[in-house]
Every structure is written in C-alpha cells, then in structure tokens.
C-alpha cells in the first residue's frame, strides 16, 4: 500500500524526471516534501520494493518504472486541467478556412505533434456508426465505373470497379436503384448486415444472371468500412520506439483499431502504458481523448510517445485542442447543414 507521503514523493520524482530525464535523489525532494532526508530515502526504498521506482545504473538516484508511471496515471493525473498559457496559440492555429473534415483533423494532429514532439493520430466517427446519405455510380469507361458514397452528408468515399462481363447498362441502373432504395439513411453496420441477409434474395429477383453480383456488392462497399484516419509526426517514433512499432504505424487501419480498443465506450479519456508484452506498442504510452463531432458522433485524438512523458502537460494540451477543435467542427457542420446562399 502506498501512503500519502509516498504518493507525493512518487509524483514529484515523476515531475522532475520527465523534465530532466535524470535520476532523482532525496536531496532534490526535500524542498517540496516536509520530511527529513532519511525519511524520504526510506519511502523511496519502499516505493522501489513495490516496483514503482527503480535504481539508476550511473547514480544513487531513482527513476520511475513503467509500473510507477501506470500508478501515477491511475491515481494522480488530473484529466480536467487546461493548458491556459497555450490557449491563444491553439485558437490562432485554427483561425483559417477549412474545406474538408480531414484538413481540420490534420491541423489538430499537427498542432499536438508540435506541442508534444510525439506521434499523433486523429480518428473520425467510427465507420460502422456513419450513415449513408447519398449514392451514385459514374461510368468511367467501357469496362470501369466508380461508386460514390456520401456518409453523414459530409464525407465522400469512392470505390472503382470493373463492370462484370455479363452486365448490361440497365443492370448498373438496377444496382444503383437497389442501393438507393434499400441502404440510404442506414448506418454502415446496418448495410453490412443487409448485404448478407436481404440482398441475395433481391438479386435473384432483379438480375437475370446473378454470378458475381454479391461479390460486386462486397467489393464496392468494402471502402466504407475503412477508418478515416490522419496522422502527424510519424517520424518522431524513431526517437523513442522500436522498429516493430514504427512499422506498425504503416498499417493505419490496425493503428485505428488499437487506439479504439484502448478506450472503452464509457470513457472520454484514457492513458494506456503498454509493457514489453504488447508487441505492437511495446514500452509506449498512448493518451487518448474523445472529441465531439457535431451532428455525427465522436472522434478520437491520440498521442503516442515514450513512457517517460510529462502526462499532466499533455493532458492539459489535448484538453485545449479538443475544445477548440469541437468549436471549429461546430462551425464547419453548421455551415454544411445551412442553405449556402443564406450564409453571409
């Protein structure tokens, strides 16, 4: 069990260590901890026994262990503080006109990367929760066409495909009509279910030759299930991550899944410190925070960095970016939902 004084000592060691990256001795703590040097040393020894501190090889000082950082995150981190001294710069960064959602998310990711020196990922609303609001097929050539999906009246997804050999022009119109009648207004998850339950019977009814039609449905809708993800500061991983982690970030869909799995449905923020047993994010910390995307749902901002981060400072920064980002997205979607010619 960690006493209140021992927790204060651990918090102070982490605060000093994340700023200096040097082992911390008892003398450095005496000004802030109202106890003798001997008492502080005894408490540090007890924290070491509990696995929260570890000895440095080059000095008599102590450093926080991975378990120490995990304890700090769980018991001492304030998730509601704001980096008030950085509010102006963050607001200023968003003071520009954006033409699509991805540009706004990229600005947020770039800003957090500049502030933290870490890698940052921003995720749109989870694909399965997005709603199909428009659909069309554009014929590109004699044998190719483009399926164009609009999700949540704001995000466009395209899927190019080869027109099946046995398809007539009227078959493309049937395909378009079925999708518009059966899928518009439904979530991507609902559509995934309908393709497996309703569509096989409908195809039998409307198409003379049904070969490959289900496969075509699967192909053109596959893109809708991909995460809309932006990333910034990937090169920063080279400063603190192993090669396996760096290569893992070449697979954005897997990165998105990893981030989502680290944040429960009922959590707005979380700090996850991965130990060496978790190969894809071994010895890395992930600070995840949900943000509101008005009229649509929630997205996620995630900072990925080394374990010895200044967690409180990063939480303060991500809180400010979240608030300013939500304000910008509110303006963006209010404009999208308004009559263009009535907006001044």
UniProtKB/Swiss-Prot annotation:
The keyword Transcription applies. The keyword Oxidoreductase does not apply. One of its GO terms (molecular function) is DNA binding. Keywords: Repressor, Stress response, Transcription, Transcription regulation. Transmembrane segments: none annotated. InterPro entries: GAF-like_dom_sf, HrcA, HrcA_C, WH-like_DNA-bd_sf, WH_DNA-bd_sf, WHTH_HrcA_DNA-bd, WHTH_transcript_rep_HrcA_IDD. One of its GO terms (biological process) is negative regulation of DNA-templated transcription. Belongs to the HrcA family. Negative regulator of class I heat shock genes (grpE-dnaK-dnaJ and groELS operons). Prevents heat-shock induction of these operons. This is Heat-inducible transcription repressor HrcA. It comes from Streptococcus pneumoniae (strain P1031). The lineage of its organism: Bacteria, Bacillati, Bacillota, Bacilli, Lactobacillales.
């Amino acid at each position: 069990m960690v006493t209140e004084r021992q927790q204060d000592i651990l918090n102070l060691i982490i605060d000093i260590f994340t700023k200096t990256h040097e082992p911390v001795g008892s003398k450095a703590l005496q000004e802030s901890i109202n106890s003798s040097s001997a008492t502080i040393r005894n408490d540090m020894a007890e924290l070491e026994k509990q696995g929260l501190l570890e000895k440095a090889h080059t000095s008599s000082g102590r450093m926080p262990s991975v378990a120490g950082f995990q304890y700090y995150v769980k018991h001492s981190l304030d998730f509601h503080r704001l980096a008030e001294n950085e509010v102006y710069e963050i607001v200023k960064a968003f003071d520009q006109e954006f033409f699509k959602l991805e540009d706004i998310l990229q600005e947020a990711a770039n800003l957090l990367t500049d502030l933290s020196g870490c890698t940052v990922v921003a995720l749109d609303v989870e694909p399965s929760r997005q709603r199909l609001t428009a659909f069309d097929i554009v014929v590109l050539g004699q044998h190719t066409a483009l399926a164009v999906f609009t999700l949540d009246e704001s995000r466009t997804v395209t899927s190019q495909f080869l027109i099946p050999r046995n398809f007539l022009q009227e078959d493309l119109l049937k395909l378009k009509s079925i999708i518009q009648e059966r899928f518009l207004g439904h979530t991507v998850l609902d559509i995934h279910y309908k393709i497996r339950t309703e569509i096989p019977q409908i195809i039998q009814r409307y198409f003379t030759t049904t070969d490959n039609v289900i496969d075509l449905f699967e192909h053109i809708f596959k893109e809708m299930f991909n995460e809309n993800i932006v990333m910034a500061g990937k090169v920063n991983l080279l400063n603190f991550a192993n090669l396996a982690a760096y290569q893992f970030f070449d697979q954005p869909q897997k990165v998105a899944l990893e981030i989502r799995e680290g944040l429960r449905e009922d959590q707005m923020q979380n700090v996850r410190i991965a130990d060496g047993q978790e190969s894809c994010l071994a010895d890395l910390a992930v600070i995840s925070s949900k943000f509101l995307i008005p009229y649509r749902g929630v997205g996620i901002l995630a900072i990925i960095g080394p374990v010895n981060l200044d967690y409180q400072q990063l939480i303060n920064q991500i809180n400010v970016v979240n608030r300013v980002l939500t304000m910008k997205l509110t303006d963006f979607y209010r404009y999208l939902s308004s009559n263009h010619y009535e907006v001044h």
